[in-house]
């Protein structure tokens, strides 16, 4: 199907890709159940609370492949279909059921209707246009489909829960993936990406038809619920639309800041040295980097000393809650919040600011998380971007430097860069990735109001820790 041109990006084709085959039996590791009716996956509180935010949109910039056009697209669609064989719920559709008692439930139907695969071209865009500046060009947002779509929209409009757009550039290719956040979190997102790239990389060598031989762990598709949790969860709303809040999208710009492994070690050592002699837990590398950002952003926003500010950070539940297996595909994350005034953050230093973030994460032990899940069933609350990004005083960080981004070699070279799409972009959104040199390096994709972002780039203390683009 022919598409149109959008910001120099022209859609060439758009189709649904279904899982390669239907495996014969269920084993909890990605095979279809041997029955004719449509399998239904009920969503957990961790899934449902994210129903009113945008899809996850992240992608990788790859070198120019040895083939192009239809040959490239057909090969990628073939490996994509094989990856969907393991992650077959990603080819399904979200649905909701409004009940006569004033409640609604949401679930994932494993219908095999397919995931969207878009082929696009942007011959006027070069790799250097994306990576040679601190500022991210706006064209990057055009490298994704299903832009600015909320999770609930997939149920009300029967949209795919997963989409991929392959955009051929002048001297490279960008693979942008979009996943409904109620279907999976960042761990699940990169698990699928890693699986797909590994399947494609050898051209099938060493991987059998049933996909044995993969080094990437097999996905575990069965959802995890508390023993006391009702399934399905009936939320006290007459319609799914009553849960949804669409946030006002203000004008923002993005910069991509990379911190070398040496710079990260220096920030971590400084933060821990400043807190030496106090009864505090060791501050992590990520907490030190985020504290460095928080302090600089308060300066860039020109916040008065008495102004309250907060930082919301994603806290992973895998490894914190017993019973969640390795390879779990679903959401297993919550938001922790650190709060202080701008004056405190400036005066008390990097170590104290990092300690606030450390305490926000440490407050989520297993007992706390279980209590939160039990309470959610009785009193559901939802994540809204308008709450996470508050009037130019807040920051929110998602993703993780532990995600394997630069291991996604599709067979013609490792990624040159990683960039995300328009999803959930608001003033104060900072997305963290592993750095391109790996080995402890990190990158922050920071989205802010243009004037404040310009002041951040001009902040000498902040930029001294940043590696400038070549």
How should these model regions be labeled?
Residues 1-40, 75:
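Cytosolic, low-complexity regulatory segments enriched in Ser/Pro/Gly with interspersed Lys/Arg
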Residues 13, 23, 34-38, 52-89, ...:
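Soluble acyl-CoA-dependent acyltransferase catalytic core bearing the H(X)4D motif
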Residues 42-46:
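Detector for long, low-complexity, acidic/polar
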Residues 15-19, 239, 420:
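Positively charged, low-complexity intrinsically disordered regions
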Residues 390-470:
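Low-complexity, glycine/alanine/valine/leucine- and proline-rich hydrophobic stretches
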Residues 49, 161-167, 427-435:
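Short, surface-exposed beta-strand/loop micro-motifs that present aromatic residues
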């Amino acid at each position: 199907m022919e598409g149109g041109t959008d910001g120099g990006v022209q859609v060439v084709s758009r189709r649904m890709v279904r899982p390669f085959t239907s495996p014969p039996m269920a084993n909890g590791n990605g095979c279809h159940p041997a029955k004719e009716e449509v399998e239904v996956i009920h969503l957990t509180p961790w899934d449902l609370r994210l129903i009113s935010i945008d899809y996850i949109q992240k992608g990788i910039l790859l070198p120019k492949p040895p083939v192009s056009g239809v040959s490239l697209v057909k090969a990628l669609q073939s490996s994509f279909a094989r990856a969907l064989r393991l992650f077959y719920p990603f080819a399904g559709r979200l649905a909701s059921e409004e009940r006569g008692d004033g409640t609604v439930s949401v679930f994932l139907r494993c219908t095999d209707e397919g995931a969207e695969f878009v082929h696009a071209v942007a011959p006027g865009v070069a790799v250097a246009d994306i990576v040679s500046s601190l500022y991210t060009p706006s064209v990057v947002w055009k490298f994704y489909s299903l832009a600015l779509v909320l999770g609930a929209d997939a149920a009300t409009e029967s949209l795919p829960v997963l989409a991929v757009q392959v955009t051929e550039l002048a001297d490279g290719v960008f693979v942008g993936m979009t996943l409904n956040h109620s279907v999976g979190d960042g761990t699940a997102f990169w698990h699928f990406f890693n699986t797909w790239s590994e399947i494609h990389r050898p051209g099938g060598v060493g991987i059998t038809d049933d996909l044995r031989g993969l080094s990437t762990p097999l996905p575990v598709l069965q959802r995890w619920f508390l023993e006391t949790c009702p399934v399905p969860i009936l939320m006290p709303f007459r319609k799914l639309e009553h849960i949804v809040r669409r946030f006002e999208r203000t004008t923002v710009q993005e910069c991509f800041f990379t911190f070398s492994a040496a710079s990260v070690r220096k920030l971590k050592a400084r933060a821990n040295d400043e807190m030496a002699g106090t009864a505090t837990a060791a501050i992590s590398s990520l907490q030190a980097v985020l504290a460095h950002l928080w302090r600089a952003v308060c300066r860039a926003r020109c916040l008065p000393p008495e102004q309250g500010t907060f930082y919301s950070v994603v806290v992973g539940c895998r490894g914190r809650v017993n019973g969640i297996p390795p390879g779990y595909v679903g959401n297993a994350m919550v938001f922790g919040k650190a709060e202080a005034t701008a004056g405190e953050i400036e005066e008390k230093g990097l170590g104290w600011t990092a300690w606030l973030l450390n305490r926000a994460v440490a407050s989520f032990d297993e007992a706390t998380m279980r209590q939160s899940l039990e309470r959610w069933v009785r009193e559901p609350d939802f994540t809204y971007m308008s709450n996470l990004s508050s009037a130019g005083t807040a920051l929110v960080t998602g993703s993780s430097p532990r995600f394997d981004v630069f291991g996604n070699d599709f067979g013609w070279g490792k990624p040159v860069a990683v960039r995300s799409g328009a999803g959930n972009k608001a003033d104060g959104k900072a997305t963290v990735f592993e750095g391109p040199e790996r080995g402890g390096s990190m990158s922050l994709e920071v989205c802010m109001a243009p004037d404040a972002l310009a002041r951040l780039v001009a902040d000498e203390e902040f930029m001294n820790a940043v590696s400038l683009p070549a």
